[in-house]
Amino acid sequence: MSLSTEKKAAIVAEFGRDAKDTGSSEVQIALLTAQINHLQAHFAEHKKDHHGRRGLLRMVSRRRKLLDYLKRTDLALYQSTIARLGLRR
């Protein structure tokens, strides 16, 4: 269950440095957050989907590693990113 192309483009436009910036940490974190939120809604209905849950845990782990990297390299950008995404960290 991936995101639609339009939704990805909107996230890249909001968090990226330009329209084609898909590799920066904040864009990757925002895309992973959108996918994680989508999958959480899926698991509320499909509680026994253990294969999908493993993929969700991989995404959460990847997002955590990217957030740790961003915090180490650019603290101000890290704080603004988690505030814009509404993450608890």
Swiss-Prot record:
Residues in the signal sequence: none
Molecular-function annotations in GO: rRNA binding; structural constituent of ribosome
Domain of life: Bacteria
One GO biological process term: translation
Pfam families, sorted: Ribosomal_S15
Keyword set, alphabetical order: Ribonucleoprotein, Ribosomal protein, RNA-binding, rRNA-binding
Key word Ribonucleoprotein present: yes
This protein's GO CC annotations: cytosolic small ribosomal subunit
Entry-linked InterPro entries: Ribosomal_uS15, Ribosomal_uS15_bac-type, uS15_NS1_RNA-bd_sf
Similarity remark: Belongs to the universal ribosomal protein uS15 family.
Annotated function: One of the primary rRNA binding proteins, it binds directly to 16S rRNA where it helps nucleate assembly of the platform of the 30S subunit by binding and bridging several RNA helices of the 16S rRNA.
Subunit structure and binding partners: Part of the 30S ribosomal subunit. Forms a bridge to the 50S subunit in the 70S ribosome, contacting the 23S rRNA.
HAMAP family (UniProt xref): Ribosomal_uS15_B
Name under which the protein is recorded: Small ribosomal subunit protein uS15
Organism annotation: Haemophilus influenzae (strain 86-028NP)
Upper lineage: Bacteria, Pseudomonadati, Pseudomonadota, Gammaproteobacteria, Pasteurellales
Originating gene: rpsO
